[in-house]
Amino acid sequence: LLQVMNSKNSFKSEKALNIDNNTYKYFDINEVAKQFNLNLLQVPISLKILLENLLRNEDGESVNKDMISSVFRSLNNNDNEKKEISFFPTRVLMQDFTGVPAVADLAAMRNALKNRGLQPTIINPLSRVDLVIDHSVMVDKYKIHNALEQNVKKEFERNKERYEFLKWGQESFNNFYLVPPGAGICHQVNLENIAKTIWIKEINNQNYLFPDSVVGTDSHTTMV
């Protein structure tokens, strides 16, 4: 999943915002809505996030001017043709059941590049990935004050090899973050600790502001 953030800015929607002597760039959907006579008060927040996502990630290939124009026209009932659009989520949320195989796949791709004499470290998640280990801890101890501590300790003993592998992944891959067992279920950790309303990312020495969006490897991941 790729965050382009190198927008062609065909609709001249990139704006600057100054806060405490710091300059931030962002993509203003209002600027484009005016060009299509679209009343944004009638557009749901979820679709506004998609509109901003398209403007910010316009690379001319995955997202181009025609695609963006079509979406804005459709929201104004001026384009009824069904089309696919691109979406680049800010981050990916995984739990251990789905996350461990994904890390193994990334490791396998690095090995494949190394075997071909290429630089293996170019293989990294292109969007932020948070892997929350929340499906593993078994209840061996209970009704004592340090039950959680003992259960987590036992979990590390049982699955030492897996945790060593995940620790290697966190140390080796860019944009990969690990939440250890005992911190909470992935949805709780996502809402309380990981999610932000607005993210800041530095591109070419310039800070960009954009809303949070997430794809989860669970059927009911919640987005702020």
Regions found by a protein language model. Give the residues of each.
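Fe-S-dependent hydro-lyases/dehydratases of central metabolism
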Residues: 4-224
